[in-house]
Amino acid sequence: MATKQRKVTQKKSRRKVQRGVVHILATFNNTLVTISDRSGLVIASSSAGACGFRGARKGTPFAAQTASEEAVRKALDYGLKYVDVMVKGPGAGREMAIRALQQLGLGVTLIRDVTPLPHNGCRPPKKRRV
């Protein structure tokens, strides 16, 4: 029986990305942080749930900060230096996630709120009676 010859291939090199976009989705229940390059290819992502927070703790500002730090640490391997920040949602973790980006040494060049606002579109759900 013939033995298989293995091909020796080079490891795919990591592409260098200096400028990127950070998308922060802050809901009342969780915070998601996604870092991509300018064309939209995702480099790194994290969420409060992926960082080990469960239940009501996922919606806290500290959980958002932890998720943001973890995503930035992954993205720094690609040589990321400057980012535009797009924030969506009404959650508690909006400001803390942006602050965590700045603390880890990323240059924030732009902060834009991209929360969708209806121009009186769909009828909202009925009011809660507690």
From Swiss-Prot:
Molecular functions per Gene Ontology: rRNA binding; structural constituent of ribosome
Cysteine disulfide partners in this protein: none
Keyword terms: Chloroplast, Plastid, Ribonucleoprotein, Ribosomal protein, RNA-binding, rRNA-binding
An individual GO BP term: translation
Matching PROSITE patterns: RIBOSOMAL_S11 (PS00054)
Major localisation: plastid
Localization (cell): Plastid, Chloroplast
GO cellular-component term (any): ribonucleoprotein complex
Source organism, top-level taxon: Eukaryota
HAMAP family xref list: Ribosomal_uS11 (MF_01310)
Subunit comment: Part of the 30S ribosomal subunit.
Similarity comment text for this entry: Belongs to the universal ribosomal protein uS11 family.
Official protein name in the record: Small ribosomal subunit protein uS11c
